[in-house]
Amino acid sequence: MIRKHTRRAAKAAFAISLGVAIVLGGSAAAATKRPAAAPTIVIGTKNFTEEFVLGQLYKQALEAAGFKVSYDENIGSSELIDTAITSGKINFYPEYTGVIVQDLAHKTSPSTAAATYAAAKAFEQTRGLTLLNSTPFYDSDSFGMLTSTAKKLGVTTIADMKKVKSFSFAGYPECRTRVTCLVGLKKVYGLTQAKFVPLASISVYTLLDEGKITAGDVFSTDPQLGESKYTVLTDTKHVFGFQNVAPVVSQKVLAAAGPKFAQVVNAVSAKLTIPAMIAMNKAVAIDKDTPAVVAAGFLKANHLN
């Protein structure tokens, strides 16, 4: 996944435990049981809107539960943030399970979302990391174009693009070397005629609207896809894989933080449906709200902070 797939009584429990500590004279024994005594959770995010929202959701929920959190936003691509967590610069970040399997472990995409999660978790555990629960929503790379272009070319699936003599396809620079992007499109679908256009600061949707590209790498939770103006071609060969989000966390930090840590994170993940993520992505990307404000509103609405 290149970019792009937010939602306690724990706060009350923390307040109660704090009250007990005060009644007991603020004993050291009581204080060591509080989440605040756990190691600092160093959260990192990749370099796109959805990751900023996810990072804020986990950050704010953990802070509300009493954990100390350090936040490092916009680290970069999957490869860069993977280096950050394996080097110990961060110890937690949200990742897409298919990206772990295909782009980091360099394995073939499994045939189901559950198998993809299992393979991703097994890979991370060989490196001193692990995965917490995955989200209901998935956000995979997708082959997007203007609906008018799709109709003109007579295409509904990615495989149909084989009959198009030549076309341009835009994506982030790392798309060029990814199995879940241009490499897969060429090897699996045989789209060797595709001319790659690397994205810099301009949106793929802007390039589509201006007629500067034929198609581009979009994401299934992009708010723009709610408009009939754009069409996503069906990925019949599953090049883009299964891309549910699962927090990657250091095994040492997970053990030291105690069971409450995983409970808080998993409770947030469980609420992150496709409609919820599309709405939050829209609030940030189109309505120009900040990820922090959007995340706070979602957590409050779902009683997670």
List PLM regions with ranges:
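Immediate post-signal peptide segment of exported/extracytoplasmic ligand-binding proteins
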Residues: 30-42, 62-63, 159-168, 300-305
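A conserved helix-loop-strand patch within extracytoplasmic ligand-binding domains
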Residues: 113-169, 251, 270-274
